[in-house]
């Protein structure tokens, strides 16, 4: 028995929700360890569609314990709204099966306002954020001025912490020419939301440690993708947290030895939302076709995703930076019917071949992909549930990906339905 960490191996939107839900049946606990309510994911269970943003995917299964770890930035109003929405769909959620780290950093309205102000100030400097306050909240966390969940339970010290926070933010707001935040009004809002979120607060690191010692299976659910990691991604076009697998330890308070098997999720092609380098992007009718077939629009924002061929170099890089043991390859069915399929096997930078994406923003923009052409397949892979259901060329495509990225495929997904999954190796039994 082992615990499992799930991370996106590309730029997010890889289909983690379905895979986490598929794995959650075997887990006792599902825990989010980074990001915020910018990480939309969709679950389709028994014909019912659930759209999540902040809550762990395991929350739709009331028998599982779902946890939001300290590495997450937590919007209390978004939390309350999402819980209410799921309850309206018949999902049983309460403090008995959902816990939130008491030391989690809060996202406040002032964070969302600052995020939006920056993003809309100039198209030239836009990063492509969701404008939900994620980055500014992480800034306050690192700047040691953040309001944390447990602060809401301490009315004696909260006013001082709010004043410290507003000393910083009101200076920024004056510089931008917008109204300052009134400390009294903010304290009133926090007092109103406190009783709706504090019942979920817990010492998560301690809870998880006890559960691990009891032999419970823990599933760590990553958000976004490793290529959006603030250190290892395509900086500055990244998110504001670490998204690689190692963050599962830091973002929950567990030691690295508790993590176990690392499963990387990647599409059979590549997508990206927002700005930033994308070596294999297709700006032609093929890219449009992939986007239409794959329904490549953001769950939270509705933003159209950029589409391109599978980039084996980027996934291989993620396999190394996240220590991935096996891949879950999703949306293979979207490539059905193509005469040929291109796979990026390397890069050319200023006339020289290189085997990884350089760290510099300028170099990333100049990179040219080197492609290998693979014969496509006509027989549909949609809804396949075993290797025997797949056409020979589709199997060859999967095997070639394994060779190029240096990692085996543990799971293969052929539709949004959780049952349409081909299991090669069970991560919990690896």
From Swiss-Prot:
SUPFAM superfamilies given in the database record: P-loop containing nucleoside triphosphate hydrolases
Record Gene3D superfamilies: Adenylosuccinate Synthetase, subunit A, domain 1, Adenylosuccinate Synthetase, subunit A, domain 2, Adenylosuccinate Synthetase, subunit A, domain 3
Residue numbers binding GTP: 12-18, 40-42, 305, 331-333, 413-415
Residues the entry annotates as binding substrate: 299-305
Pathway: Purine metabolism; AMP biosynthesis via de novo pathway; AMP from IMP: step 1/2
EC code(s) of this entry: 6.3.4.4
Active site (UniProt): 13 (proton acceptor), 41 (proton donor)
InterPro entries: Adenylosuccin_syn_GTP-bd (IPR018220), Adenylosuccin_syn_Lys_AS (IPR033128), Adenylosuccinate_synth_dom1 (IPR042109), Adenylosuccinate_synth_dom2 (IPR042110), Adenylosuccinate_synth_dom3 (IPR042111), Adenylosuccinate_synthetase (IPR001114), P-loop_NTPase (IPR027417)
Gene Ontology molecular functions: adenylosuccinate synthase activity; GTP binding; magnesium ion binding
Cellular location(s): Cytoplasm
GO CC list: cytoplasm
GO biological process: 'de novo' AMP biosynthetic process; IMP metabolic process
Keywords: Cytoplasm, GTP-binding, Ligase, Magnesium, Metal-binding, Nucleotide-binding, Purine biosynthesis
SMART domains hit by this protein: Adenylsucc_synt
Reactions this protein catalyses: IMP + L-aspartate + GTP = N(6)-(1,2-dicarboxyethyl)-AMP + GDP + phosphate + 2 H(+)
Cofactor(s) recorded in Swiss-Prot or TrEMBL: Mg(2+)
Protein residues bound to IMP: 13-16, 38-41, 130, 144, 224, 239, 303
HAMAP family per record: Adenylosucc_synth (MF_00011)
Family: Belongs to the adenylosuccinate synthetase family.
Subunit structure, as described in the record: Homodimer.
Protein name: Adenylosuccinate synthetase
Protein's organism: Nitrobacter hamburgensis (strain DSM 10229 / NCIMB 13809 / X14)
